[in-house]
């Protein structure tokens, strides 16, 4: 679903994917949790990891949840291969660099935190007394929760998402009408980007829940895909349509993702990121380049859309262009020229049908 979220988010998703309910690793962790033995598991057997291992014994056997459960009864750590297919060592003592800072309490969790920061590997600490599973990697710390708790939160987030998508639909419908009338203001654009990013942040939360739930999340995943199928793509295309020409739209998108919730509320702050400083949002009119609308026309390749925007600069000019003018653009023949003209006409008609211009 989410393709371009920030790297830290993606790292956490990767971790949750391999530990979702139903995976062999999660089954092993749950067995240890139920037995209340506690445990420390390191994923990865690189030289860097083996250099801080002292003692224990070599297993080098195929991974299975029952093997891990039995080995966790011993005090030492378990070392798994990076692909979690083999158990490399057991009952190992780990000697991380004591100068690596940690705010964890308890020997097991302090060791796990330090190793994760020192090596960048995934380290799992299973608490004997608190009965929780904590995952560490680099500076990430995440506590796995019971599926019933996550399912409740996921359903609640889904209800919130439905409300946000409803508001976003109205904002986008309004923007569509204004784009075809060439009456878009910076306020309209920044509101659309703000609302889209708000939706994407809830989607990311939902994706995290889905990763944690594993095969228990099929229904929620289907509902999520139905709700927000093209939302992230729309946000990127909005930025391409309206950011200043000298700016890299991917960097702009990264900056918007990095905004805090408080900053995201401020439309002037979003406007500044897109290259507009010290201008009144409501009174400043701006024309779209046309990326978003052209991408909505079926069977028009991305490279052709690039050529159209490069030639005509604005959506208004594309709409006013004749078949002959479109035909001259590289990659556009008579058939594509008709497809673009007819496609834009249909989109304009649809926008007028859907219009729900928000009174400001």
From Swiss-Prot:
Enzyme category, top tier: transferase
Gene (name only): disA
Organism: Clostridium tetani (strain Massachusetts / E88)
Binding site for ATP: 76, 94, 107-111
A biological process term (GO) from this entry: DNA repair
Protein's UniProt name: DNA integrity scanning protein DisA
Molecular function per GO: adenylate cyclase activity; ATP binding; catalytic activity, acting on DNA; diadenylate cyclase activity; DNA binding; hydrolase activity
Top-level taxonomic group: Bacteria
Subunit structure: Homooctamer.
Boundaries of every DAC domain copy: 9-147
Database matches in InterPro entries: DisA, DisA_sf, DNA_integrity_DisA_N_sf, DNA_integrity_scan_DisA_link, DNA_integrity_scan_DisA_N, DNA_integrity_scanning_protein, HhH_motif, RuvA_2-like
EC nos: 2.7.7.85
Job description of the protein: Participates in a DNA-damage check-point that is active prior to asymmetric division when DNA is damaged. DisA forms globular foci that rapidly scan along the chromosomes during sporulation, searching for lesions. When a lesion is present, DisA pauses at the lesion site. This triggers a cellular response that culminates in a temporary block in sporulation initiation. Also has diadenylate cyclase activity, catalyzing the condensation of 2 ATP molecules into cyclic di-AMP (c-di-AMP). c-di-AMP acts as a signaling molecule that couples DNA integrity with progression of sporulation. The rise in c-di-AMP level generated by DisA while scanning the chromosome, operates as a positive signal that advances sporulation; upon encountering a lesion, the DisA focus arrests at the damaged site and halts c-di-AMP synthesis.
PANTHER family membership: DIADENYLATE CYCLASE, DNA INTEGRITY SCANNING PROTEIN DISA
Catalytically driven reaction(s): 2 ATP = 3',3'-c-di-AMP + 2 diphosphate
Keyword set, alphabetical order: ATP-binding, DNA damage, DNA repair, DNA-binding, Magnesium, Nucleotide-binding, Nucleotidyltransferase, Transferase
Pfam family, one: DAC
Lineage per the UniProt record: Bacteria, Bacillati, Bacillota, Clostridia, Eubacteriales
PROSITE patterns reported in the protein's UniProt record: DAC
Residues spanning the membrane: none
Family the entry assigns: Belongs to the DisA family.
Cofactors required: Mg(2+)
